[in-house]
């Protein structure tokens, strides 16, 4: 009988040890997709970009940033240029160029390399601007408003008001 008792105890111990050694299958690795992240959306808001009167000799650049997750940012604004002061007459003598550039285009512009612009107005002294910018995806995007004086001999005064609606 002692042998049966030892055998029963050994069998019981093996069952306890065997039950304790069972492993659960490993959990699958979590894959995080960037679109799973929730971030505040700028939809329904506006951002003032530029409201200024300045003297334009050769060119002037104004940077602004579109926040992440802006699906259809819309640039709206006005500019008027004058050959003398901001309250003078605005005619062909006050014509300037206006460009909207992304960072790559701006780097080309600054480096005097040929490049395209997202939006261009040439030879204008009074212009309304309504332009839909590309969506910003998951990162903020920087843009530049560039005012250029094709007549480098005579300075011009430029009045601007620009905003972005999301």
Residues covered by each model-derived region:
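Bacterial N-terminal signal peptides that target proteins for export
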Residues: 1-9
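Hydrophobic helical h-region of N-terminal Sec-dependent signal peptides
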Residues: 10-15
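C-terminal motif of bacterial Sec signal peptides marking the signal peptidase cleavage site
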Residues: 17-20
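Acidic, Ser/Thr/Pro
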Residues: 22-166
């Amino acid at each position: 009988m002692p042998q049966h008792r030892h055998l029963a105890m050994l069998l019981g111990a093996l069952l306890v040890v065997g039950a304790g050694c069972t492993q659960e299958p490993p959990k699958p690795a979590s894959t995080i997709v960037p679109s799973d992240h929730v971030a505040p959306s700028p939809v329904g808001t506006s951002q003032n970009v530029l409201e200024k009167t300045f003297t334009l000799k050769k060119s002037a650049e104004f940077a602004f940033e579109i926040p992440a997750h802006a699906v259809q940012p819309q640039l709206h604004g006005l500019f008027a240029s004058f050959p003398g002061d901001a309250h003078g007459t605005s005619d062909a003598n006050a014509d300037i160029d206006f460009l909207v550039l992304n960072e790559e285009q701006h780097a080309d512009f600054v480096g005097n390399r040929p490049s395209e612009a997202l939006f261009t107005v040439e030879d204008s002294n009074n212009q309304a601007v309504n332009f839909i910018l590309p969506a910003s995806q998951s990162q903020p995007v920087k843009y530049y408003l560039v005012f250029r004086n094709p007549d480098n001999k005579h300075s011009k005064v430029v009045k601007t008001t620009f905003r972005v609606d999301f």
